[in-house]
From Swiss-Prot:
GO terms for biological process, alphabetical: chaperone cofactor-dependent protein refolding; protein refolding
Modified residues (Phosphothreonine): T197
Database matches in InterPro entries: ATPase_NBD, Chaperone_DnaK, Heat_shock_70_CS, HSP70_C_sf, HSP70_peptide-bd_sf, Hsp_70_fam
Lineage: Bacteria, Bacillati, Cyanobacteriota, Cyanophyceae, Gloeobacterales
Protein name: Chaperone protein DnaK
Length: 638
């Protein structure tokens, strides 16, 4: 088995790590950074930029720069109306699904496709670092991700050409990294507030056993929401002063979003920051500039309700684990948003103790994923990981009632069955509607899929016995079987319908991703060829100047002609001609260098016995034993 990497596919940033010599190592990307922005851009030239390169050009290309895509993955359009308003690019409806529109590509992309490009970069950078092709990974997801979002994340991996060996919950991964070397038993609470999601998990950790006792969270709460409060505040204040709503201009919105994130980060270290955006828009009286100050106190008041929203999941997790805050030994902070002082103070107030900040909140999840990858590949032994399903799973029964089959916080993998019957006399088929959530009515929960079991022998209502079995694998992904006990007929469904993509969609996207990779490779090769050809032309010109009159006029004319033809081919971007002329010019320059070297060889050769120093002279000049030889005494001075 080759190397398996661990990937934290984040809302804002992503990280890849690997085990080396039994120790987890975070892999720097091609730009030298240990975190890669989860940003993808499509340029006018149809180049695909990923990471820092994409982020840098976002202000100039807001409609084709995709960020915070994790907030849309595996979701239906009706579930993301608030999030869609927070981004500068267009989020469009495709039936009930979500697509992201690129004007430069004139195409709608599924969130999975965009995430796949981020995953592909992470794996490519890891392959270069390790010196071997990486094809397998463990990918993390928020603990509170539902079945659709987990399935969609797995689809993103497949589109990127990665075999996803395991989907692992982010707080669980963080606990793995935190507790790997700990022998004493501890009860820890992992508080994970990232760019787009919030999770809290309680685990018992010690001596290689990691048992999740409960998990809770909010997949609509993260650093992006804090940024948005600053954006709205700045936009509202600017509108009062200038009468212009900057949120209606995509470029201005992108600049505001970047400035808001920067201000939020700065306010973790200082109590006041200045936000200065010159030429943010223009009116009839000329350019307008935004120049405002923001204090930490104002920021905290803007986000007060968001901060309060983290309390309920923490309390829920404690209740589900049947623990009080006094039972918690350590609170581990994960995610960049936990650097906000108000968040740290809130955690301290809720739990009653200072949070443990010994781990890097940006990297700890990827490190834990790498450890889990090591467990699966056999590199790490004596580690037992017992995770849970975050939300209850069940079926819709008569009257639209939600009937749970697997309650939330059940340890996975697991398999549970319930027996149901028909609702009408002579009924020969039943529809199984699979749902996920905590509400009492089925319609208020997440619908994961429907399927029919036909061929039930006619009988009075309530007589047939239909056994419904739920099976959750270690990834937290569900399959359901319905079986009529009398006839033995059964129907199984893997809840892939929960994903927003069909198998055909995924297969098509895999093929497109492979062709894009081929196109990108060709484009890179063309750029390299242009740079090499341009450099060669410059070097050839310089050599002609340096050699001057030593170059025959015929050789000079030939090389100058090749340089001229090569530059014309470069301007036409005729790459076949460029390659041919580059080879011809290389040969001509080589031939000229060889010719000039041979011409200079006789005059530069060492003198023979009849010229210069006589044989056996030891390299001393002068004549042997002649009158011109002067003997001198040598005295050493001490």
């Amino acid at each position: 088995m080759g190397k398996v990497v661990g990937i934290d596919l984040g809302t804002t940033n992503s990280v890849v790590a690997v085990l080396e010599g039994g120790q987890p190592t975070v892999i720097a990307n091609a730009e030298g950074s240990r975190t890669t922005p989860s940003v993808v851009a499509f340029t006018k030239n149809h180049d695909r930029l990923v990471g820092q390169l994409a982020r840098r050009q976002a202000v100039l290309n807001p409609e084709n720069t995709f960020y915070s895509v994790k907030r849309f993955i595996g979701r239906k359009y009706d579930e993301i109306t608030d999030e869609a308003k927070q981004v500068a690019y267009r989020v469009v409806r495709d039936g009930s699904n979500v697509k992201l529109h690129s004007t430069n590509e004139d195409k709608d992309f599924a969130p999975e496709e965009i995430s796949a490009l981020v995953l592909r970069k992470l794996v490519d950078d890891a392959s270069k670092y390790l010196g071997e092709k990486i094809t397998q990974a463990v990918i993390t997801v928020p603990a509170y991700f539902n079945d659709s979002q987990r399935q969609a994340t797995k689809d993103a991996g497949r589109i990127a050409g990665i075999e996803v060996l395991r989907i692992i919950n982010e707080p669980t991964a963080a606990a793995l990294a935190y507790g790997l070397d700990k022998k004493a038993n501890e009860t820890i609470l992992v508080f994970d507030l990232g760019g787009g999601t919030f999770d809290v998990s309680i685990l018992e950790v010690g001596d290689g056993v990691f048992e999740v006792k409960s998990t809770s969270g909010d997949t609509h709460l993260g650093g992006d929401d804090f940024d948005r409060r600053i954006v709205d505040y700045l936009a509202d204040e600017f509108k009062k002063l200038e009468g212009v709503d900057l949120r209606t201009d995509r470029q201005a919105l992108q600049r505001l979003t970047e400035a808001a994130e920067k201000a939020k980060i700065e306010l973790s270290g200082v109590t006041q920051t200045q936000i200065n955006l010159p030429f943010i828009t223009a009116g009839a009286d000329g350019a307008k500039h935004l120049d405002m100050s923001l204090t930490r106190a104002k920021f905290e008041s803007l986000c007060a309700d968001l901060l309060r929203r983290v309390e309920k999941p923490v309390e829920q997790a404690l209740r589900d684990a049947k623990l009080s805050k006094e039972n918690i030994d350590e609170v581990v902070l994960v995610g960049g948003s936990t650097r906000i002082p108000a968040v740290q103070e809130l955690v301290k107030r809720i739990i009653g103790k200072d949070p443990n900040q010994s781990v890097n909140p940006d990297e700890v999840v990827a490190v834990g994923a790498a450890i889990q990858a090591g467990v699966l590949s056999g590199e790490v032994r004596d580690v037992v990981l017992l995770d849970v399903t975050p939300l209850s799973l069940g079926v819709e029964t008569l009257g639209g009632v939600a009937t749970p089959i697997i309650p939330r916080n059940t340890t996975i993998p697991t398999r549970k069955s319930e027996t149901f019957s028909t609702a009408a006399d002579g009924q020969t088929s039943v529809e199984i509607h699979v749902i996920q959530g905590e509400r009492s009515m089925a319609g208020d929960n997440k619908s994961l899929g429907r399927f029919r079991l036909d061929g039930i022998p006619p009988a009075p209502r309530g007589v047939p016995q239909v056994e419904v079995t739920f099976d959750i694998d270690a990834n937290g992904i569900l399959s359901v079987t319905a079986k009529d006990k009398a006839s033995g007929k059964a129907q199984t469904i893997s809840i892939t319908g929960a994903s927003t993509l069909s198998k055909d969609d995924v297969a098509k996207m895999v093929n497109e991703a492979e062709s894009f990779a081929g196109e990108d490779k060709k484009r890179r090769e063309a750029v390299d060829l242009k740079n090499e050809a341009d450099s060669l032309a410059y070097q050839a010109e310089r050599q002609l100047t340096e050699f001057g009159d030593k170059v025959d006029s015929s050789d000079k004319s030939k090389i100058e002609g090749l340089i001229k033809d090569l530059r014309e081919a470069l301007s036409r971007e005729d790459m076949d001609k460029v390659a041919s002329l580059k080879a011809d010019l290389q040969q001509a320059v080589y031939d000229l260098s060889s010719k000039l070297y041979q011409q200079s060889a006789p005059s530069g050769a060492a003198a023979g016995p009849d010229e210069g120093a006589p044989s056996g002279s030891g390299g001393t000049s002068g004549t042997r034993g002649g009158d011109d030889v002067i003997d001198a005494e040598f005295t050493e001075t001490k």
